[in-house]
Every structure is written in C-alpha cells, then in structure tokens.
Amino acid sequence: MEIKKAAFVISNTDVRKCPDTRLPEYAFIGRSNVGKSSLINMLTGQKGLAMTSQKPGKTQLINHFIIDDSWYLVDLPGYGYARLGASNRESLRRIIETYILCREQLSSLFVLIDCRHEPQKIDLEFLQWLGENGIPFSIVFTKADKLSFSRLKENTEAYKQKLLETWEELPPVFITSSEKKTGKEELLDYIDSINQELATK
C-alpha cells in the first residue's frame, strides 16, 4: 500500500472529542524522542505532516491525521519524560490510557522503541500493560540505520527474549529507519491487511 493523501484533522486531550466516525484508527506511541514524528512523516511521504523536534516530550496531544479518506493515523503523546513534572506526567498517562482502553475505533497500536538501547523497564512495563488489557499492538524498532547489523540483531533479540519470559508468543515486530525508509512498505502493507480484514466483517 502507498499513501496518496494525508491531512491533519484535529488535536485534543479528550478522547470524547476525537473524530466521530467509524473509520479504523492506527495509533503510534513511544518514549520521548524515539523518532515518532519522523516515522509518521516517512510513512505518509509528507516531510512536515507531524512536527519533529529535538526537544523530548513535544507531543502532548492526541493528533489525528486522515489517510486516503479511509483510515486515521493517530499520533499519541510520548510516555516517560521526567522533565514534564509529576502532575503533567499523570495527566498524559490518563490521556494515553483513556484513548487506548476506550477508543473503539483503535484497530492496532504501534509501540515505537529505539533499537539503539537495551531493553528498558518503562517499555517492557508498557508492553506488559497492553498485553494484560488485550490491546492489539505491534513493536516498531526505530533508528535501525544507527546500528551495525549485528548490534541491531543483538538488541532486538534481547527485547524478544525478555518478552518471551512471560509471553507465549510475540506480537508483530517491524524494523524501521526513517532516514533510509526501511520498513515503510512492511508497515503500510500490515495496516492494509487489517483494513481489508475489517472490510469483510
């Protein structure tokens, strides 16, 4: 699948104010500065669609983008940014959890993880929470171009092994690089396969 048209629709902090349609939604989330905006821009082919920033914690709203008039790409706030302060972190946590747990249109969640780092407690705890709540999700490793092939394999396998300590099977896993456009086709084809499956129901 190739995206032909993408446009920003709305930003808000209240799931009740999200677009009132039955179109499927695919949400992207990750720790601050994981490369989420760059990945969204890469997937849509629009360099400035999602605002990129070197300042962690920039995205603090639920951002909806309409894709080819048939589905929504949702940019969720990043999690785990300490400098926001306790009250702001709690507010963001509520926004994120309410959207994930209550938004019926959410077809799949993509959890972005910076492949340069070893398994992080905050990521593992979030993935565990998703599993416990039965949320359909995939893991998207970002910034693959920053590592050698052997180091990339080592780090991604470390995450998989950590998850298999408590899980019987792994969710879908994607390796991406916004710089090299690695993983673009695989991610979009996966979304397209879910859309086609939903269309038959």
Swiss-Prot record:
The gene is engB. This is Probable GTP-binding protein EngB. Mg(2+) binds at residues 37, 59. One of its GO terms (biological process) is division septum assembly. One of its GO terms (molecular function) is metal ion binding. CDD domains: YihA_EngB. It comes from the Bacteria. GTP binds at residues 30-37, 57-61, 75-78, 142-145, 173-178.
